[in-house]
Amino acid sequence: MAIKVGINGFGRIGRSFFRASWGREEIEIVAINDLTDAKHLAHLLKYDSVHGIFKGSVEAKDDSIVVDGKEIKVFAQKDPSQIPWGDLGVDVVIEATGVFRDRENASKHLQGGAKKVIITAPAKNPDITVVLGVNEEKYNPKEHNIISNASCTTNCLAPCVKVLNEAFGVEKGYMVTVHAYTNDQRLLDLPHKDFRRARAAAINIVPTTTGAAKAIGEVIPELKGKLDGTARRVPVPDGSLIDLTVVVNKAPSSVEEVNEKFREAAQKYRESGKVYLKEILQYCEDPIVSTDIVGNPHSAIFDAPLTQVIDNLVHIAAWYDNEWGYSCRLRDLVIYLAERGL
């Protein structure tokens, strides 16, 4: 039986999750909550400037959208506790508004009748933060109801750090994410609490903050406090890159040794037999650029030619589609919860 899913917030991630999940026999999307009307939601689902036209049929009704003949209820509730998830038999809510990222607010979905909530961002005081391929085995269905899927950057970074830590032992490190602009920035100069994000996104390199590196400690506890990082938002709408430099305890003998560890890890994930692990890490030796990874479902695309080694100082780089790759992990996390009996 398919797991029933509701989506709260039908923005970039909400719609990408819908696309990634639609047609999968394990998942049935039954409802969407968003303050925008159904007509607009249907249009934005069908036509996407980055990911193209939706391959199925999409039409709007007064309080629903119809996709490939299946009607999906649309609500416009500001208070998550008022969304009738329970009446629809919803098992999991994808909390994708970017607003309800703390325990108090996310738990309102449980009041509405949902069994589990997955927050599509780093969260304040969730029951657990899960990064597939890194710490999913820590999930306990009986104890964990409010789950953070971390950020797109952490989902790229964590598998890479895991490989390095297991192979060489990470002493400390620093990450820079070269990140596509997002809706949290301004199209043209306009006030923002972050003065740099107030500047026009499509014509500037915008230095800003990221919690992705610090969040590693939540999924790899022995590295808590050992990593930090920063972000550079750049003028592309999708497709990002992490640049990671670490000091390791055991110096690798060569660049080739580092790359071989990633090649082996990518193969291990791919051949794991677990549907939710197949697309964690991809090994690439081609001289690619950001456009080449848009639409790539992997959490991290390791760029082997960019690896550098100086004694016990190791530098690696990995690409990620910050929308599609992350949304595919959301989909796979739902599947994983179902496999664990919710």
UniProtKB/Swiss-Prot annotation:
Matches recorded under PANTHER family: GLYCERALDEHYDE-3-PHOSPHATE DEHYDROGENASE 2
Keyword Zinc-finger appears in the UniProt entry: no
Binding annotation for D-glyceraldehyde 3-phosphate: S151, C152, T153, T182, R197, T210, G211, R233
Record-linked PROSITE patterns: GAPDH
Residue numbers binding NAD(+): R12, I13, D34, K78, T120, N183, N322
Protein name as annotated: Glyceraldehyde-3-phosphate dehydrogenase
GO-annotated biological processes: glucose metabolic process; glycolytic process
Superkingdom per UniProt: Bacteria
Site (Activates thiol group during catalysis): H179
Annotated catalysed reactions: D-glyceraldehyde 3-phosphate + phosphate + NAD(+) = (2R)-3-phospho-glyceroyl phosphate + NADH + H(+)
One GO molecular-function entry: glyceraldehyde-3-phosphate dehydrogenase (NAD+) (phosphorylating) activity
Gene3D superfamilies named among the record's database cross-references: Dihydrodipicolinate Reductase, domain 2 (3.30.360.10), NAD(P)-binding Rossmann-like Domain (3.40.50.720)
Organism: Aquifex aeolicus (strain VF5)
Family label: Belongs to the glyceraldehyde-3-phosphate dehydrogenase family.
Catalytic center residues: C152
Subunit structure, interactors included: Homotetramer.
Gene name of this polypeptide: gap
Coiled-coil intervals, chain numbering: none
Alphabetical list of InterPro entries matching this protein: GlycerAld/Erythrose_P_DH, GlycerAld_3-P_DH_AS, GlycerAld_3-P_DH_cat, GlycerAld_3-P_DH_NAD(P)-bd, Glyceraldehyde-3-P_DH_1, NAD(P)-bd_dom_sf
A single cellular component GO annotation: cytoplasm
